[in-house]
Structures are given as structure tokens and as C-alpha cells.
């Protein structure tokens, strides 16, 4: 059994990934925002009372001392999944963008995962087989950008990818991977997305639980295929 820390578990990919990992017998430490609808999450907690641990956390406003104290109740964290993210402003034309608003996307999609990873380093170091995964997007690939647009989302995810690459070089004993989960039917992905969140959760679980098939520092899609930077 692995102890798995996941951010943003109250909806979308985070919720179904949590559910899938619990069904597979793992223990999940999940974070959710105070202002989110947690009814489904509380029902899941009642189904897995011993293996689902929940804590309120906003990746934009992390109370470091509070999170550190909470984490001290766990011996180690084996897997960190930085899942929380936003698609801010969507595909607004460049000339209409409020450039200062980029900071919100950077705070959530880039700085949030960096802060969480930093705070969890001591607990990851106590694991016999630590691993770090970040939910990124193919839209963060510079080489794959053939249509432009989505400035804030692309920039923040490209920055996350670079953080992961540097981290993998500095901490070779902690494999670190960025994963593109595919276009998933969530509030962010919309109703026309071809992949259900349940299937996305299965795909991602298969990837993160077979670490020997992945090389640290790389950028993978949900099929385990390497994507271009």
C-alpha cells in the first residue's frame, strides 16, 4: 500500500483518481478548497474511512505551518500528485487579455505545485520509493503549439514542465514526471471531451503505479508515450 498525497480531490480528475486509488487498496491524503462542494467527497470518505484522509487547502494560499503539522501525523508520503489546476481566461484573444491576470494561473498551475513539492520533501525522503507526478497538459508543449491562443494556461503549464525537469536533475533519487491526462470530460475540459474522468483515473493510476516504465524528468501522455517539449 502506498501513501499518496493528491491536491484538488473534490472534483474532476482529482476526485475520480482518488476513488480509483482507494479501490486499489492505497491510502490517499487529499486536499480540497474551502469553498468547494464536498458532498461526493464526504460520501467517499464514509466508504473509505480508514484510508481517505482529507484536509482543506488552497494552493494559492498555503498555510505552511498548518500543513507541516498535519503531515507530521503521517510517517511518510510515497507518491505526490500535484493535480489542482485552473484554465483561466480560456482562449481570449491576445489584444483583449489583462496581462496582470496571468499571475493567478502562475500561482495555481506553477507556484502551487512547487510549494507543495517543497513542503512534502521531508515526507517523500522518508519513503523507500518516493515519486512525484504533476498533472500538466499537452498545451504546455512549445513544440506542439500549432494553433496559438490559451496564453495563460499554456505559459503556466510550460513553466510547470520546466520546474519538473530541473527538479528531476537536482533530486535524482525522487523520480518526477509530468503527465498529460488527455482531453477529459470535467468542468475544465467540457462536455465534448472524449475521455471520461473514470477512464482518465484508470489510465493515470496505471501510469503512476508502474514507475519503472517511466523515466524521471520526462513529459508523458496518459498512454505512457513521451511528448515533445
Residue ranges: model-predicted function:
Residues 86, 90-106, 114, 125-169:
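Catalytic loop of short-chain dehydrogenase/reductase
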Residues 10-20:
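N-terminal Rossmann NAD(P)H-binding glycine-rich loop of SDR-like oxidoreductase domains
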Residues 24-39:
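Conserved glycine-rich Rossmann-like NAD(P)H-binding loop of the short-chain dehydrogenase/reductase
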Residues 6-7, 82-83, 130-137, 177-180:
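Structural signature of the Rossmann-like NAD(P)-dependent dehydrogenase/reductase core
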Residues 45-62:
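Rossmann-fold cofactor-recognition segment
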Residues 58-75:
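Conserved Rossmann-fold cofactor-binding substructure of NAD(P)-dependent oxidoreductases
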Residues 178-181, 190-229:
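C-terminal helical subdomain
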Amino acid at each position: 500500500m502506498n501513501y499518496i498525497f493528491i491536491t484538488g480531490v473534490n472534483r474532476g480528475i482529482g476526485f475520480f483518481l482518488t476513488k480509483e486509488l482507494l479501490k486499489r487498496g492505497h491510502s490517499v491524503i487529499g486536499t480540497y478548497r474551502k469553498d468547494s462542494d464536498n458532498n461526493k467527497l464526504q460520501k467517499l470518505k464514509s466508504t473509505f474511512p480508514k484510508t481517505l484522509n482529507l484536509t482543506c487547502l488552497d494552493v494559492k494560499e498555503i498555510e505552511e505551518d498548518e500543513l507541516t503539522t498535519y503531515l507530521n501525523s503521517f510517517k511518510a508520503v510515497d507518491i505526490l500528485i500535484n493535480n489542482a489546476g485552473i484554465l483561466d481566461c480560456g482562449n481570449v484573444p491576445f489584444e483583449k487579455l489583462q496581462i496582470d491576470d496571468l499571475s493567478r494561473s502562475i500561482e495555481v498551475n506553477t507556484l502551487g505545485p512547487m510549494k507543495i513539492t517543497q513542503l512534502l520533501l521531508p515526507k517523500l525522503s522518508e519513503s523507500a520509493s518516493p515519486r512525484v507526478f504533476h498533472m500538466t497538459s499537452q498545451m504546455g508543449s512549445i513544440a506542439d503549439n500549432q494553433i496559438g491562443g490559451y496564453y495563460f494556461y499554456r505559459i503556466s503549464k510550460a513553466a510547470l514542465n520546466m520546474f519538473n525537469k530541473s527538479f528531476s536533475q537536482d533530486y535524482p533519487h525522487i523520480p518526477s514526471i509530468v503527465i498529460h491526462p488527455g482531453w477529459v470530460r470535467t468542468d475544465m475540459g467540457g462536455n465534448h471531451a472524449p475521455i471520461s474522468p473514470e477512464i482518465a483515473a484508470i489510465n493515470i493510476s496505471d501510469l503512476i503505479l508502474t514507475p519503472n516504465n517511466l523515466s524521471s524528468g520526462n513529459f508523458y501522455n496518459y498512454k505512457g508515450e513521451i511528448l515533445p517539449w
